Amino acid sequence: FLGLESGDNISLKRFQKHTTVDENKMAIHLLREYGIEPTFGFIMFEPNSTLESVRNNFDFLKEMDVMTTSAVTAHLLHHRQTLLEGTPDYQLMISEVPDTDAGTSFTNYEAQYKIKDPKVEAFSEIITNVCRTALSLLPKTFYCDTNASTTSNKPTLNALNNTLIAIFEKTLSCFETKSIPYCPDIIREVSQKLIPEFDITLLKFKQQL
């Protein structure tokens, strides 16, 4: 297991990881040189995420060829930082959030929060719905393994994985070009339009098998 956490240097500094993106890349290359393919800890979204940091994270995952199966990809692309009670980030969130903020709630375990940038929060909401749908389509016996070749229905799962990556990139580009405004109704509409892309992909490959 390798806790990379981010492909964005500003985020790594905020996480106090004491490492850089280039050092993370070197670590992955070194492990692979010795035939080791680790599982990765990664945080796509956190309270201070920006569209730039999300883009950096996504480009990092693509460059390092980490998104190898639909199970792995779906987890990596929507994972949010968990703010556990007793951690500095939890305490910081408590100090920053007014009591009247309906977007953040605190339990005895963790803080539920909205990302400060509403555009990123909206993007996260869409991608979370998409990724959960992808996970629900996986076979019940599917293991979250980095080697998709161990599954009997590899072509279909590869297609699902490629569709998931394409949806993420297409939607992120829309937010970057401001073609998707932040509006709850529009966000729900975009989510509903993206989900059928999985059904279309799966139907095509079922017809070929």
Task: Name each model feature, range by range.
Residues 90-91, 96-209:
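Radical SAM enzyme core and accessory elements
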Residues 3, 7, 35, 41, ...:
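Residue-identity detector for glycine
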Residues 1-39, 43-67:
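Conserved non-cysteine loop/helix-boundary elements of the Radical SAM core domain that shape
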Residues 10-14, 44-52, 68-125:
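Flexible glycine/acidic-rich beta-alpha junction loops that bind and position SAM and/or redox cofactors
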